[in-house]
Swiss-Prot record:
Phylogenetic placement of the source organism: Eukaryota, Metazoa, Chordata, Craniata, Vertebrata
PROSITE patterns membership: IG_LIKE
Protein name: Myelin protein zero-like protein 3
Subcellular locations according to the entry: Membrane
Its biological purpose: Mediates homophilic cell-cell adhesion.
Organism: Mus musculus
Stated family: Belongs to the myelin P0 protein family.
Main localization, broad class: membrane
Domain Ig-like V-type: 33-149
Length: 237
């Protein structure tokens, strides 16, 4: 009898490590869903804000996957459901976020992000993103602290300055290059005139053609004037 008890006790001791390994592996399988989100997000009144949330699951995405976003105002323990997803998007139709929450993710890429349109100062608070993808249902729930502020004069000024740099600097560079080129050309002409530079046959021909053209224009103007005078005299008689 004592020998039998010792044998059973030995088997129990031998099975304990095996059971421990199975429990640990099972826990790893259940807890393999990981969710990540920005801890702090800053936005401006009236400008759309994106709240990013990504997840990694060991299981394939199916129609059983669910996503839930909640909101908690500052200095409050009350939470408000603002978005639900299961094969389709279901943004809230009540409360302060009514008609302002839109889907900005892709579950097949592990993206569970949403966007807030026309944010106000009243939207400040804490947002949470919860994802369940059976059998992966246990996971961490990351929190995102949203801070909405008015755009200050400094921010607007920086935007104007950036626009000025992008528009006016290239134009200024082009103008400077043209002025430098014109200056070099004028300097070259002065040096040639001082050193007794003689024009080539092509340059002389161009000047001659220009003079002939000017003479022709002068003659044409004189001829037109004579015709007008003759017509005037005939009408007088």
């Amino acid at each position: 009898m004592q020998l039998a008890r010792g044998t059973v006790g030995g088997r129990g001791c031998a099975l304990f490590p095996l059971l421990s390994i199975l429990v640990v592996q099972g826990a790893r399988i259940v807890l393999s869903l990981e969710i990540s989100a920005d801890a702090h997000v800053r936005g401006y009144v009236g400008e759309k804000i994106k709240l990013k949330c990504t997840f990694k699951s060991s299981s394939d995405v199916t129609d059983k996957l669910t996503i839930d976003w909640t909101y908690r105002p500052p200095s409050s323990s009350r939470t408000e459901s603002i978005f639900h997803y299961q094969s389709f998007q279901y943004p809230t139709t009540a409360g302060t976020f009514r008609d302002r929450i839109s889907w900005a993710g892709n579950v097949y890429k592990g993206d569970a992000s949403i966007s807030i349109s026309n944010p106000t100062l009243k939207d400040n608070g804490t947002f949470s993103c919860a994802v369940k993808n059976p059998p992966d249902v246990y996971h961490n729930i990351p929190l995102t602290e949203l801070t909405v502020t008015e755009r200050g004069f400094g921010t607007m000024l920086s935007s104007v300055a950036l626009l000025s740099i992008l528009v006016f600097v290239p134009s200024a560079v082009v103008v400077i290059l043209l002025l430098v080129r014109m200056g070099r050309k004028a300097t070259g002409v002065q040096k040639r005139s001082r050193s007794g530079y003689k024009k080539s046959s092509i340059e002389v021909s161009d000047d001659t053609d220009q003079e002939d053209s000017n003479d022709c224009m002068t003659r044409l103007c004189v001829r037109c004037a004579e015709c007008l005078d003759s017509d005037y005299e005939e009408e007088a008689y």
